[in-house]
Amino acid sequence: MLHIKDLIWTLYFIGTAVALEVNIVPDQGEISLGESKFFLCQVSGEATDISWYSPTGEKLVTQQQISVVRSDDYTSTLTIYNASSQDAGIYKCVASNEAEGESEGTVNLKIYQKLTFKNAPTPQEFKEGEDAVIICDVSSSIPSIITWRHKGKDVIFKKDVRFVVLANNYLQIRGIKKTDEGTYRCEGRILARGEINYKDIQVIVNVPPTIQARQLRVNATANMAESVVLSCDADGFPDPEISWLKKGEPIEDGEEKISFNEDQSEMTIHHVEKDDEAEYSCIANNQAGEAEATILLKVYAKPKITYVENKTAVELDEITLTCEASGDPIPSITWRTAVRNISSEATTLDGHIVVKEHIRMSALTLKDIQYTDAGEYFCIASNPIGVDMQAMYFEVQYAPKIRGPVVVYTWEGNPVNITCEVFAHPRAAVTWFRDGQLLPSSNFSNIKIYSGPTSSSLEVNPDSENDFGNYNCTAINTIGHEFSEFILVQADTPSSPAIRKVEPYSSTVMIVFDEPDSTGGVPILKYKAEWRVIGHEKWHTKYYDAKEVNAESIITVMGLKPETSYMVKLSAMNGKGLGDSTPSQEFTTQPVREPSAPKLVGHLSEDGNSIKVDILKQDDGGSPIRHYLVNYRALNALEWKPEMRVPSNSHHVMLKALEWNVDYEVIVVAENQQGKSKPALLSFRTTAKPTATTATASAGTGLGTGAIVGILIVIFVLLLVVVDVTCFFLNKCGLLMCIAVNFCGKAGPGAKGKDIEEGKAAFSKDESKEPIVEVRTEEERTPNHDGSNQIEPNETTPLTEPEHPAAVEDMLPSVTTVTTNSDTITETFATAQNSPTSETTTLTSSTAPPPTTAPDSNTIQSIQATPSKAEAPTTSSPPPTSSPKVAPLVDLSDTPTNNPSKVVANQAGPLNPSAATSAAEPPTVIIKPVTTVPPNAASPPPTPEPKQVKQEQSGTKSPEKEEAQPSTVKNPTEATKDESASLSNTKPLQDEDFQIDGGTFKTPEIDLAKDVFAALGTATPTAVASGKASELVSSTADTSVPLDSAKTEKTQVEEKSKPEEIDVKGTPAEVKTVPNEATQTNANESKA
């Protein structure tokens, strides 16, 4: 019993000892100067007191930088804020109670100095060309490793030997350049702690200044109280300060006659006098150096307009604007507005403007003034010395003029604005009336008025029929008044559309309809289709967006049952509501059968030798489509590529790694449980393989190889001519001397030695010391001004007049330049220099018999895709350049336009051969069903019927290529045109005769190219080779659409089972393309 009692007491004491065990978390600490840290003291067991003691043995209590918090009976937290070096040492946590005494735990706190930068100023500036030393001093408790980085790279790895890291870790750049400017990173690392720190230092390189006078010689007018500005443009870094000297003496800013702009780059001399004529110097100075430029001020007397006056008149009155001017010689006075020039002594055909000029005065008379005559008028006085111009403002006061639509439609409960636009000067007051009562009124609480600077809007929220009717807008100003009646008409629901055709299939029905005769005054928003099974009462409904339906006026209802009789009707809906329905029409869906042929739309990719073929699902025949079978081949190949099986949920297939400049045909067949559909055919042509020297559109207007070679040949010929002429006159030899002796009977050089000496004397220069001065007058040209005044010469007058640019147009037609079938397009004739013309790449969709028999198809002419004028892009690429032009100078400003032909894809009937698409949308190809049966492994490859070839004109092609512009499909009513219209509408310019489809190119002008090659003894290269373009034969519903061509890319054809894209895998094809050459549409472009 005694032993058990002793054991119990022993276990009690052991449990008490464990309860007072002290743990500190974390058990050790290391922080840098200025950082903060806390320690948690955890006690096992109940403690009456938990205390913290500093390294000096003092009990810690909460103070400014130290916090001691006891959370509960078992924990206490010590927090040290903004640690200093004195805070380092061993901290002790002591826990105690009355029964067991004390228990303690310790933690050692170490404090170190982080890696810091003491002396690393930023920015640091240096002078260009000097040896720069970038300073960076690093401070840390233990040594650190310093590295320098610039633009993300270590400067040590730079191949430039100018970069050197000195022993004190400074970076030296020998002969620093402006390109060395930037941010340099001084990075320090301490391996023992894994510590890293860095400082970005901005290095600025100062560049010595340069200065240049904007005008080396400035002319001014004397004694006319005018000012002249002398300007210098200085450059350097930092921006230099500019000072001025006159005859070597500094010019102070405080002088009364002289003033400067903010940066002193412009010096203004007020009230110029003859004494101000001198040589002025502008000096630029900055931290890196100094530079100087000089300007000569030459003082003349030029015209001065002494009188102009702003005028105000009332519409239909007559007024005279007067301008007086002085000057020596007497100046001539002309008039100009913001949009036109008015010559002196001029009278318009209608007598509206009359100008009379007198000595030092001109009078401009306006008769029957209109409000459009108001604006700014400029009086220009000019003489051989200079020009003066001043503006006067002519104000026209006129009675109000009301604009805006007079009929507005709405319905009850739908607010609408009736806008009355008023043009008047002075501003008019606008009031609204309803049945003679001024609005707003208590009788019309549903009416609000909103007024603006030039308009007034009446908001009407009709709640009954009484709110519809006439509303009067009256505008009044001091000149007069005007009123206008606006009619608010109650909108109605639209009338019913008219069903023209119902074409049922197994699971779908296509409804062709005409739009309602009446829209009810507001736009139609949706169409509602309703159908039901005959014998059932439940109608099925679906709404179709009017914007999508109106394009073709076709609605397709899907999800029908095969061999089932239905009734269908249509109705239109606008904002007012749903209109009347059409009479119900009955139809019966076809039995379960093979699916309809899919539609194919081809998109030639940018690389030029691959194509994305969109597969548009049609009627599935009442049975889900299992897959699509895709076959394709080059037309010149006997064998088809391996057949591809595309999942039914895939919407397109990619054909890659095709041969360049080759015609291809693609056949796609849909298959369901009942069998295979008729094949859908797509025909297209890949572009020509781009050359390595092909320039992109962004390459600017650089010269091509042909142009450079031509220029070198011309220079070489000119040098030969110069040398031969020199030998003829100086040494009596050379080709010209030989011709003169043999054909002109001139004596040889040995017969007249004395004459040679006399000839030399004759060609010697005059020894007179008198200067030879040639005086030419400058002719001032004013647009729309036939008269010109001679200008007296001055020291700045050039001895030769500048050559005025001439309009140059190359009249040689290009290879495939044809009239494009796009709306309001200007006919263009491309040349070997400024054209890449568009070689039409066509995608042909057709229905054709099986490959074993030749398909009978209607040919669709290739469409040259060019943008319409109305949709011309805001920015255009500069025309590429190639060989120099040799054609005569011709102005093409009156180039005739060609009316485009339209095309509509008709699934049931053949297309007109001249059908085309207009330029509005990206190029697409709509493929209709064909009867051609795709080849399979069991049957031999089909032999295609030889297609008729239409020769195209050939010509010199520029290495630069441009893409063909997109086209869009027009309204079906515009589809049918005569086949020859697209070409016969082309009219030759001036006296030239052009035959686009094989014929001669004629021009009465002299062909400069023939002259040049005749002088060289070589044959003239043919600019135009006659030929005929190939005609692609397609069957019923064929469509040819040009495809876009761009950059080249050759990739393997892959087949994927994803719905997004199916890539073709098979034998890699040879890649050959002819890049599309965009038609040049800037026919009026002038070149010198």
Curated annotation (Swiss-Prot):
Membrane topology (UniProt): Single-pass type I membrane protein
Binding site for heparin: 149-153, 158-162
Signal peptide start-end: 1-19
Broad class of where this protein is predominantly found: membrane
GO biological process, one term: cell adhesion
Comp. bias (Basic and acidic residues): 758-784, 1046-1064
Residues that carry a glycan: 82, 219, 310, 341, 417, 443, 472
Topology Extracellular: residue spans: 20-705
Span of domain Ig-like C2-type: 20-108, 113-202, 209-294, 303-397, 400-484
Domain Fibronectin type-III: 493-592, 594-690
PROSITE patterns, per database record: FN3, IG_LIKE
Gene3D superfamilies: Immunoglobulins (2.60.40.10)
Localization of this protein: Cell membrane
Biological role: This protein is a cell adhesion molecule involved in neuron-neuron adhesion, neurite fasciculation, outgrowth of neurites, etc.
Protein name: Neural cell adhesion molecule 1-A
Originating organism: Xenopus laevis (African clawed frog)
Gene that produces this protein: ncam1-a
